[in-house]
């Protein structure tokens, strides 16, 4: 856990001194440190290349201090995301040195500005320090690290502003890690009922209303599509509705965040392989994303109205489970031919979207889902595939993503693609064939948005990682939380 303070404390009083360093000459007022850096640079032990880390130990009057040099490369090439990644790497060095207090020598990067530089540094450290070890019997106690942020360029009158920037960065990191925790919980502990209970606790903490509908209430709402997916499990489905009204003068404007909430997905009778099932606790990554986003929005008291909806269930096999060849209904009244029970997420989402529009009066929709393997094939592990019916809405998302470093890419949605999901014996079929799988899955949901401005975010790539990143460990990443928050935040300015 990292705590952050802005103050004019002495840099010699901490266990470590963290110095961001560009390849070009970095101005460091302390002559002793400058001399040490010049020596190691002459010996070519450290150049300041991007991501390079070098440690020097020095003795002060009453302390032995580690000086961590963090290479940022060329200043002309630095970005907010590069800063985040570099500081995420620095966490490993701080951990290796067992530092409990760190002085971060802060200088604003002129091209990025004070706010963005500071925010990226804090997010890199806070997100990079995340770990999920609650099930390890020999887990080490979490070390609390205090980061003192200072520098000769921080003016006295800027301290309060810097503290506000840090507060926002810490909150976004916290709610991103909240989403990571939800995804990382094993499915034997995180099933629809326990997820609903957890969301109630989260709502109490962050300041939003939560209402949970049980299976009988869901049936009364005629959400047959959602219920069909969960029929094979003994863990009964739950519809989780979160409400935050920060702009009560404009109650007709309500942004709905709809997250896919498959707490486990075996594929049903269209069964996945064992390897394909191992990580399927992560199939509620969309739900985790919208829960994290509304938590941050509510805690910051943004002037916006947000509804978050999660249709939580498990897709398993039993004598009650739905089958390929079935025809099912939906809350919107449309019928669906089931060709593949592993194309289940879209079936839960369409009822959740219909609920958001008809019962919660949503004026705009963003659905977030770990929906298709095709998104991974087309865009890789780090990019969110996006379908929209309004390019201006996508433009908002794209601008927000530039701020957060979470990559998004708009997929085509030509009218011809919609023909691929038409059924001969029902209104629609739940899979469009082997081509354009990400697009047809998104357009299937688009059939239910009732002409509302809509974004579909397929986070199948970035939501769960099997390799460690610079500021994200293996497992749930919390993809989408910061970008959804940023989109909402920009509307309030």
From Swiss-Prot:
Binding annotation for Mn(2+) 2: 260, 265, 283, 344
Textual note on the cofactor: Binds 2 manganese ions per subunit.
Single Gene Ontology MF annotation: manganese ion binding
A GO biological-process term: proteolysis
Location in the cell: Cytoplasm
Catalysed reactions, semicolon-separated: Release of an N-terminal amino acid, Xaa-|-Yaa-, in which Xaa is preferably Leu, but may be other amino acids including Pro although not Arg or Lys, and Yaa may be Pro. Amino acid amides and methyl esters are also readily hydrolyzed, but rates on arylamides are exceedingly low; Release of an N-terminal amino acid, preferentially leucine, but not glutamic or aspartic acids
Sequence similarity: Belongs to the peptidase M17 family.
Name of the molecule in the record: Probable cytosol aminopeptidase
Gene: pepA
């Amino acid at each position: 856990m990292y705590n952050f303070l802005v103050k004019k404390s002495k840099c010699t009083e901490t266990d470590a001194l963290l110095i961001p360093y560009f390849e070009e000459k970095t101005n460091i007022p302390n002559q002793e440190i400058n001399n040490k850096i010049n020596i190691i640079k002459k010996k070519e032990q450290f150049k300041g290349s991007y991501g390079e880390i070098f440690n020097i130990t020095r003795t002060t009057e009453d302390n032995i201090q580690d000086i961590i040099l963090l290479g940022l490369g060329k200043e002309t090439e630095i970005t907010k995301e590069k800063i985040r990644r570099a500081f995420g790497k620095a966490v490993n060095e701080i951990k290796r040195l067992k530092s409990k207090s760190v002085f971060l020598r802060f200088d604003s990067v002129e091209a990025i500005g004070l706010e963005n530089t500071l925010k990226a540094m804090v997010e890199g450290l806070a997100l990079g320090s995340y770990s999920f070890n609650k099930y390890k019997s020999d887990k080490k106690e979490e070390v609390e690290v205090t980061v003192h942020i200072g520098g000769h360029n921080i003016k006295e009158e800027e301290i309060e502003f810097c503290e506000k920037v840090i507060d926002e960065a810490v909150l976004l990191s916290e709610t991103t890690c909240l989403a990571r925790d939800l995804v990382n919980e094993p499915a034997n502990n995180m099933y629809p009922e326990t997820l609903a209970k957890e969301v109630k606790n989260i709502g109490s903490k962050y300041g939003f209303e939560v209402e949970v509908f049980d299976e009988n209430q869901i049936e009364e709402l005629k959400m047959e599509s959602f219920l069909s997916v969960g029929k094979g499990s003994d863990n009964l489905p739950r519809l989780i509705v979160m409400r935050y009204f920060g702009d009560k003068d404009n109650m007709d404007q309500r942004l709905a965040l709809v997250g896919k909430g498959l707490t486990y997905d075996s594929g049903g009778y269209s069964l996945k392989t064992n390897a394909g099932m191992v990580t399927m606790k992560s199939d509620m990554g969309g739900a985790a994303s919208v829960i994290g986003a509304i938590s941050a929005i509510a805690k910051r008291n943004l002037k916006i109205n947000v509804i978050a909806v999660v249709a939580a269930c498990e897709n398993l096999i039993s004598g009650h489970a739905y089958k390929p060849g079935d025809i099912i209904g939906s809350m919107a009244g449309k019928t669906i031919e089931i060709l593949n029970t592993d194309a289940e997420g879209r079936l839960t989402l369409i009822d959740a979207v219909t609920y958001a529009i008809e019962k919660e009066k949503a004026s705009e929709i963003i659905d977030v889902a770990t929906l298709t393997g095709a998104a991974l094939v087309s865009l890789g592990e780090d990019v969110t595939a996006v379908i929209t019916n309004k390019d201006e809405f996508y433009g908002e998302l794209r601008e927000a993503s530039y701020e957060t470093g979470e990559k998004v890419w708009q997929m085509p949605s030509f009218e011809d693609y919609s023909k691929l999901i038409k059924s001969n014996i029902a209104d629609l079929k739940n899979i469009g064939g082997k081509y354009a799988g990400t697009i047809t899955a998104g357009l299937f949901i688009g059939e239910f948005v009732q002409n509302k401005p809509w974004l579909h975010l397929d986070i199948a790539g970035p939501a769960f990682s099997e390799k460690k990143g610079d500021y994200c460990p293996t497992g749930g990443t919390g993809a989408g939380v910061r970008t959804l928050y940023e989109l909402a935040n920009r509307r309030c300015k």
